[in-house]
């Protein structure tokens, strides 16, 4: 699945959860994914969300794409991973 297709398919879910930004990182952003690779998304919200909303977002995105989706916020990234995530980041939705 190409990056643009992922963005188009998940946009309604992102709107539902009041996401202000979503970007793809990891193997799918680099183009070296395997068929069973998950979808890694960095997201930001218009206002803070709780754990249940994050889990719901992951579940709905996974169902929409028929792939495992991992969602992370920038604040939850370890400093060691942050630079790697930002290097791979491919914006899909909204503004950072």
Question: Where do the model's predicted regions map?
Answer:
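Catalytic core of pol beta-like nucleotidyltransferases
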Residues: 1-21, 29-34, 46-96
């Amino acid at each position: 699945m190409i990056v643009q297709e992922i963005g188009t398919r998940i946009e309604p879910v992102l709107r539902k959860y009041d996401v202000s930004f979503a970007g793809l990182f990891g193997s799918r952003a680099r183009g070296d994914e395997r068929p069973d690779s998950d979808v890694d998304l960095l997201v930001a919200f218009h206002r803070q969300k709780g754990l249940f909303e994050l889990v719901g977002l992951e579940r709905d995105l996974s169902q929409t794409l028929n792939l495992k989706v991992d969602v992370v916020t920038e604040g939850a990234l370890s400093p060691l991973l942050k630079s790697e995530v930002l290097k791979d980041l491919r914006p899909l939705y909204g503004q950072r």
